[in-house]
């Protein structure tokens, strides 16, 4: 487990500071279990993604969050300094690379009518400040707005719109070795979700659908969990990826669609 130091102090804004002594990447698809799209091959590949040690940062990560409640609205300002959590960049030899990343943003959550509304904004500032290096992700502006409410007893629904804007897009396309596979200048994703509880809340049904009109792809996820006692639980579900193009965010994983089932028994300590 990673060691994280935290500090906090109460004043006009509450402050939370986190320091990760050494960069910790996310677990992503690397060809071990699912294939992914490789623009250099112009097709999906199941070859294991190998990241050389020199392309793996060992420097610290820093994160800070300032937050408070104002007139029923939870406001937060946050920042991060570290590296991309997935190896989205490449070195001059085409090998995967974690590039520098600084993120600043804010969020707001408050009751809206019978439900809860949320708003988020973030600016991703990377190494490629003018878009001329196609091996490094461009700076991005990200925006999210969502709403969730209980429709009837035990049935909750939510909707969300998320967008990414790639800065200096024309410059990137002009310098790219494979412009036909580059992400769009503006990517939109609409998310809908339903959550239903039954049988005295021992049965939980959960459905998500992520759909991108700009990429014309999406991801449908369904999960059912039944926990009649504290001793055991059975669950099952489906992950369905769909899309017309093999290089888009969800479309590249179409062949990775799956169904699953699990049983858990909890032993007394």
Model features per residue range: what roles?
Residues 20-26, 80-86, 124-128, 164-168, ...:
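Structural signature of outer-membrane beta-barrel domains
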Residues 10-15, 72-75, 114-118, 154-158, ...:
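Repeated loop/turn-to-beta-strand initiation elements of outer-membrane beta-barrel proteins
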């Amino acid at each position: 487990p990673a060691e994280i130091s935290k500090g906090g102090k109460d004043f006009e804004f509450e402050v939370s500071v986190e320091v990760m002594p050494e960069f910790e990447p996310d677990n992503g698809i690397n060809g071990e279990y699912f294939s992914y799209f490789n623009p250099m091959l112009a097709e999906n590949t199941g070859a294991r993604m190998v990241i050389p040690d020199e392309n793996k940062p060992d420097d610290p990560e820093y994160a800070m969050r300032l937050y408070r409640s104002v007139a029923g609205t939870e406001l937060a300002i946050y920042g991060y300094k570290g590296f991309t959590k997935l190896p989205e960049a490449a070195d001059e030899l085409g090998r995967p690379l974690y590039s520098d990343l600084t993120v600043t943003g804010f969020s707001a959550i408050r009751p809206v009518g019978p439900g809860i509304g949320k708003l988020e904004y973030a600016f991703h500032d990377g190494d490629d400040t003018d878009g001329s290096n196609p091996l490094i992700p461009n700076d991005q502006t990200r925006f999210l707005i969502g709403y969730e409410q209980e429709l009837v007893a035990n049935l909750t629904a939510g909707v969300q719109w998320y967008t990414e804007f790639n800065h200096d897009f024309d410059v990137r396309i002009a310098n790219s070795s494979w412009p036909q596979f580059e992400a769009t200048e503006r990517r939109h994703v609409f998310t809908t979700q339903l959550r239903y509880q039954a049988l005295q809340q021992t049965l939980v049904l959960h459905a998500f659908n992520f759909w991108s009109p700009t990429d014309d792809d999406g991801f449908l996820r369904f999960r059912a969990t039944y926990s009649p006692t504290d001793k055991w639980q059975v669950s099952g579900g489906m992950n369905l990826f769909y899309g017309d193009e093999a290089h888009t965010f969800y479309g590249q994983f179409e062949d990775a669609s799956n169904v699953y089932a699990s049983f858990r028994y909890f032993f007394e300590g």
